[in-house]
Amino acid sequence: MTNFPIPEMAKPYLEYDMIQNHTELPAFPEFRARLLYACLQSSGSGEAPGDEFRLPAVGGVRRGMDELYTLVTSLVQMGLDIHDMVPESSDRKEKRAARSRQLKVLAGDYFSAKFYHLLAQAGQIETIRHLSAAICEANRLKVNLYMLMKQWKLTAEEYVHQTVNIRMQLFLPFRSKMQGVVSGLWPDVLHSFTRCEVLAQEMRRLDSPQSLRGSWAYWHLWQEASKEERKQLAAEEPDPLKIRSLLHKYNAGGHLFHLLEAQVQHVWSCVKQLDSDKLMQEITQLVETFAAPLRKMKVLEER
């Protein structure tokens, strides 16, 4: 796999003692960032910024626009994600909890603002406009999702659909920086890949019934459960043992497995349409992140 310098380049913006000591950061958007970087590199869009602009050096190598676009998009995504980690209620008055909440808000604002600063330095005004519009659209979609949740009108499939659309938004505008077949396939590849990412994350959430609220499994159970079972789901502190029983009863893990398996197959069909062997190899290795665990699970089931 091609060297991926973005996490290292992001460190100067992410590693602040105050943030690290008093709150937690969301995960770096590794998969979507790798996908974007690979497609930009394949399109040959890697012109270098002007002499007046310097990205953080990694291994002494000067970086170009592919790195800049991927870096700023990743920083904005982390800014939006850390804002999502801010608790809805501020009832907890402990000094540590209050400080963590405040720093999440400030860190999110800081990461989100960095894209403007870095792109402006590089003279990328049009990219600022496109990325700003994408941020607005992502926030609009989040509001729609939260409203459906509060009104209890959300289905499990709608939850996945909405979550995927939200996570795609910041990466979609870079289609204009791509060329040829890659440009045409970018929306479908990004959608399929992001859906794999979401479904894989939802499968991992099954291991923590105590934090299942708002997940795919939660809405799946809500659709299938009886009136009495819904009361258990809606409880402020649901019994983990009862939730595990419901997950087993309504085969949440099995449904997610088949959804992810089907989505991985769709990604493979997209990959076969690419006209670059190098890019096909890059994306194949990324898809294997999702495909390999599925194969292992299937082998275990067949024993």
Regions found by a protein language model. Name each.
Residues 1-303:
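All-alpha prenyltransferase/terpene-synthase fold signal
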